[in-house]
Amino acid sequence: MERKSYSIDINRIAQYAMYAYCIFALFSLAFSVCRQAGLSFRTSPILIPISPILVTIKQLVLQLTPIALWGIFRFTLPAGVKLLRRCSELMVLYYVLSFILGQCFKFNFVTMMQNGQITPTATILTWIQSSMGLISVIASLVAGCHLCSKHRGNMRKLGIALVLVFIAWLLCSNLLPVAVFYLAGNTQQAAFTCMNLISMITTTSTYIYAYYRMYRAIKTTGCIGQ
């Protein structure tokens, strides 16, 4: 694969983005596990005043770092790999759209409820976000399969990681909830709690591994900072 050269240290930016994502993804996982267990960081006198700040920073980091990593990965790809470029562009578009819509809903730029009903605008935007989410999952799977079959080394490992992300999404978001709903019976509440814990740990682990492999692939695809 032809290597590309850049005057700015994109490799360092990707490294910082990857580290930031890993740190705050683990923080988010710990926060969610504590909440599932009935604990709260807000019970600590030290963390009471900074908890809202940490949560805000966590949300911003987890929303923005994927944009940075996928964007850098896209621009380090050679011109000949058009399929990977299109898949990467779809991923960037999805994360940018999710960030914008998230801010619109958070700051009430879009009216969610009116007279006890969801507004048509909110319905359309939610549908667009869900559709883009499904498209991004498919794009990630296509990119992963392409990398596994056409490349070697770090690029192939990234492909495996992207396929694992799809498998985790399929299991944790689709198959496990249905299985628990139909099989748990009278123990549904406890089963859903266990399922949520398993899903959070699995999803967080696969995404951390995928973005680590993406950082390694970025180093492979370009002489960054030279």
Give residue spans per PLM region.
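N-terminal juxtamembrane cytosolic/stromal segments of multi-pass membrane proteins
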Residues: 1-17, 215, 219-226
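Transmembrane alpha-helical segments of multi-pass membrane proteins
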Residues: 12-22, 82-99, 158-171
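Alpha-helical transmembrane segments of multi-pass membrane proteins
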Residues: 21-39
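Interfacial non-cytosolic loop connecting adjacent transmembrane helices
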Residues: 35-51, 106-127, 176-198
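Alpha-helical transmembrane segments of polytopic membrane proteins
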Residues: 50-64, 123-137, 173, 192-204
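Membrane-interface helix-boundary motifs at transmembrane edges
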Residues: 74-87, 147-158, 219, 223
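Alpha-helical transmembrane segments in multipass membrane proteins, preferentially the mid-helix core
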Residues: 133-160, 209-216
